[in-house]
């Protein structure tokens, strides 16, 4: 089996487990993204995950596992790194506008190349600190970026009224949840079942109080 076919097969298995039915065009672009990331990763060390097959599970499927919880017309992905979960979600949801935020120059260069080569007209890249991002967003995502308190203290003002903050975490820490800043409340905490991944994965949905 050719490498690209192997990656598509692994993606399809995961999508079936997540209950997602995607058109061939989106499936192909998701694999294009993994292949681009794998090429850049060898030179720029963008992610600790080296194997493209592992990237499908630990990056693509992990990102797509929260797709049903994204809402609104605009989304900011804070500390996006190599574009996670922002790029997989943007490929899945072209009707939304995505802003990918990262202060690391080499990661921002990769993001701009990914936007160009994947023809992501609904994505822009902001290279800088989350504290400096202009505007407000209907939805904010952050994947293992910082503690809940730090994220909300730095960037809570980016969340529009009525919007939702989707914090992707591994193992839940009671003390972290207890330290939620004033003005915010946890709407729900969900355990995520991500195919072919080891360890706990959780989604914490936060709204303004």
Q: For each predicted feature, which ranges?
A:
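S-adenosylmethionine
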Residues: 95-99, 103-209
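Class I SAM-dependent transferase core
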Residues: 1-72, 76, 106-126
């Amino acid at each position: 089996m050719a490498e690209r076919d192997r990656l598509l097969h692994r993606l399809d298995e995961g999508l079936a487990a997540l209950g997602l039915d995607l058109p061939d065009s989106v499936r192909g672009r998701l694999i294009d993204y993994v292949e681009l990331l794998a090429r850049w990763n060898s030179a720029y060390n963008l992610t600790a995950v080296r194997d493209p097959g592992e990237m499908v599970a630990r990056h693509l499927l992990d990102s797509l596992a929260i797709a049903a919880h994204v809402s609104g017309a605009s989304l900011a992905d804070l500390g996006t790194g190599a574009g996670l979960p922002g790029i997989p979600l943007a490929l899945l949801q072209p009707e939304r506008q995505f802003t990918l935020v990262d202060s690391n120059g080499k990661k921002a260069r990769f993001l701009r190349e990914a936007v160009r080569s994947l023809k992501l007209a609904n994505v822009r890249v902001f290279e800088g600190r989350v504290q400096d991002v202009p505007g407000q967003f209907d939805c904010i995502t952050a994947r293992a970026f910082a503690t809940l308190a730090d994220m909300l203290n730095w960037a809570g003002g980016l969340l529009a009224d009525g919007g939702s903050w989707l914090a992707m975490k591994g193992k839940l820490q009671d003390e972290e949840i207890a330290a939620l800043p004033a003005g915010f409340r946890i709407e729900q905490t969900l355990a995520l079942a991500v195919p072919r991944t080891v360890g706990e994965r959780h989604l914490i949905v936060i709204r303004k109080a």
